Amino acid sequence: MFWKRKITKTGGFLNHKKIPKDFLCAAKPQFGLRVIARARFNRAITMVKIGEKITDFELDAFHDGKQKKIKLSDYESKWLVLVFYPADFTFICPTELEELAENYDAFKKAGAEVMSVSTDTVFVHKAWHDNSPAIKKVKFPMLADPTGKLCREFGTYIDEQGLSLRGSFIINKQGILKAIEMNDNSIGRSAKELLRKLLAAKFVSENDGLVCPASWQPGGKTLKPGLGLVGKI
């Protein structure tokens, strides 16, 4: 049986003509409405948004030469930088993670933890870490998301490939998402720019009423929005 039930907790109805043909809805009494869809539609309705609290998660990780369980709630006293990437043993990915590793101390000094995420297993992470000169520098947790569950929640999962897009997410101490960067997989990211965004997000969180202009750096000029500033920039 097909349903036209809107995909929200509050209920309501959705025009069935707007639902893609590859969208299958099945009802189970014990669970309510279950929706199965392609990832491109999933991203539109489930991707976390700026200003929203991130749901706690737990994943296996390769860290300090060991397999560990990592939970978001274990880092409540820190800012968190999540860096999603397509796959181990590839080409752009090791350059990105190497640059993150080289700037890891600066992220920690800013009170943040860095974690990388891909759909590889912990065992593949270990093999990559053992063999790649670039990845041997990595000291931060490398999260394993082989089912793509976390990638789907953050809107980075590519259903047709089983891989993640290049997505970077900055989360504050309260678990609120403050910044997103999403790239095509052919475009590498800058660890220094990610660090700059983290420092800017921290600054405005600690200085109510002030905002950071383009390319702001610590110690640089900030702005205080108000009627007196209108038209003067």
List PLM regions with ranges.
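N-terminal targeting signals for export/organelle localization
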Residues: 2, 13-60
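Intrinsically disordered, glycine-rich low-complexity segments
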Residues: 5-7
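Chalcogenol-based redox active-site neighborhoods
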Residues: 25, 45-233
